[in-house]
């Protein structure tokens, strides 16, 4: 059965334009609803230590963007929730599946976050299903995102356990080497995996990994994503938490994967690597450019909002859209 599924990735696809019905791209609405909340863009900076910290999370929330705080500074999570709520902002945190996380979730009853993401590399697991059920029992009002997965069966199981959204993508990210270290994953066919999973989903899908250009956001939405999690495009900003490094007079920011030796502090179960990215200005500028590009995508789709992207035709062009060009 699997061999009947078309296999392609972002660079293999071109969306086909429709007649434009707006007079300016500023008329295109890029907002998206997740749970009870509306956000300015359908993008989420990856919940990684070199992408997001508490300061950036606060900035994003204040400006109407969705965020997910990483889980690698465990003791700061409760104070973070409290601080966000004191400012009237949503709290969106990550948890793992180890035994102590159950007690932590139960302790959140007195100050409940609006969103919890269960964040492990291989999310189609009994440990994730058990954690979903625990969160839904203890914090029934919290919106639960679970992942990461790469098959329709996994999406259905996590949804049936109570997940409100699932995160799709096993190792397609720029600093993820799961596909090389394990032989498994959605690297090289992430967009096809997204399409496959979205057809089975009854709840929102978050595409996670493999996004290299702003046009890939529109393609993700076309193939079933409600939101798109992005790492490398959000790394390397002046505000980014990654360490700043100078090489031959140029400044770079460190960017590493969530299961890398640099994050774990040891060479154990390593599925991520570290790279240096040229420093690229302010995060707010990237968000503005993303919004403008997505508004242009909507205008090409012949609509006024994100839903128009879901209905456009496409062609599979097998690695030829760059035609020798680079960006």
Curated annotation (Swiss-Prot):
InterPro entries: Aldolase_TIM (IPR013785), GMP_reductase (IPR050139), GuaC_type_2 (IPR005994), IMP_DH/GMP_Rdtase_CS (IPR015875), IMP_DH_GMPRt (IPR001093). Belongs to the IMPDH/GMPR family. GuaC type 2 subfamily. One of its GO terms (cellular component) is GMP reductase complex. The gene is guaC. GO terms for molecular function: GMP reductase activity. Keywords: NADP, Oxidoreductase. Its EC number is 1.7.1.7. This is GMP reductase. One of its GO terms (biological process) is purine nucleotide metabolic process. NADP(+) binds at residues 205-228. PROSITE patterns: IMP_DH_GMP_RED. The active site is at 176 (thioimidate intermediate). Coiled coil: none annotated. Catalyzes the irreversible NADPH-dependent deamination of GMP to IMP. It functions in the conversion of nucleobase, nucleoside and nucleotide derivatives of G to A nucleotides, and in maintaining the intracellular balance of A and G nucleotides. It is an enzyme of class 1 (oxidoreductase). It catalyses: IMP + NH4(+) + NADP(+) = GMP + NADPH + 2 H(+). HAMAP family: GMP_reduct_type2.
């Amino acid at each position: 059965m699997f061999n009947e599924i078309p296999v392609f990735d972002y660079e293999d696809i071109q969306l086909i334009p429709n007649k434009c019905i707006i007079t300016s791209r500023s008329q295109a609405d890029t907002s998206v609803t997740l749970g009870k909340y509306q956000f300015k863009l359908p993008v989420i900076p990856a919940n990684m230590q070199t992408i997001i910290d508490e300061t950036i999370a606060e900035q994003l929330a204040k400006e109407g963007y969705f965020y997910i705080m990483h889980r690698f500074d465990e003791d700061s999570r409760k104070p973070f929730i409290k601080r966000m709520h004191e400012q009237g902002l949503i709290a969106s945190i990550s948890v793992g599946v180890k035994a102590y996380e159950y007690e932590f979730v139960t302790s959140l009853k007195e100050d409940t976050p609006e969103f919890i993401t269960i964040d492990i590399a291989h999310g189609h697991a009994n440990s994730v299903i058990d954690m979903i059920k625990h969160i839904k029992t203890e914090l029934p009002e919290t919106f639960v995102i679970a992942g990461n997965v790469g098959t329709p069966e996994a999406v259905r199981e996590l949804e049936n356990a109570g997940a409100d959204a699932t995160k799709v993508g096993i190792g397609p990210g720029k600093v993820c080497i799961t596909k090389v270290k394990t032989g498994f994953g959605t690297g090289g066919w992430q967009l096809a995996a997204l399409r496959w999973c979205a057809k089975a989903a009854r709840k929102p899908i978050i595409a996670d990994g493999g996004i290299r250009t702003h046009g890939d956001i529109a393609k993700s939405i076309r193939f079933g994503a409600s939101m798109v999690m992005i790492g490398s495009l959000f790394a390397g900003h002046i505000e980014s938490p990654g360490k700043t490094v100078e090489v031959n007079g140029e400044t770079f920011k460190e960017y590493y994967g969530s299961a890398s030796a640099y994050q774990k502090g040891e060479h154990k179960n390593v599925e991520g690597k570290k790279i240096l990215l040229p420093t690229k200005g302010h995060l707010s500028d990237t968000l503005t450019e993303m919004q403008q590009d997505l508004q242009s995508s909507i205008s090409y789709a012949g609509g006024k909002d994100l839903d128009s992207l879901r209905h456009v035709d496409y062609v599979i062009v097998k690695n030829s859209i760059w035609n020798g060009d680079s960006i």
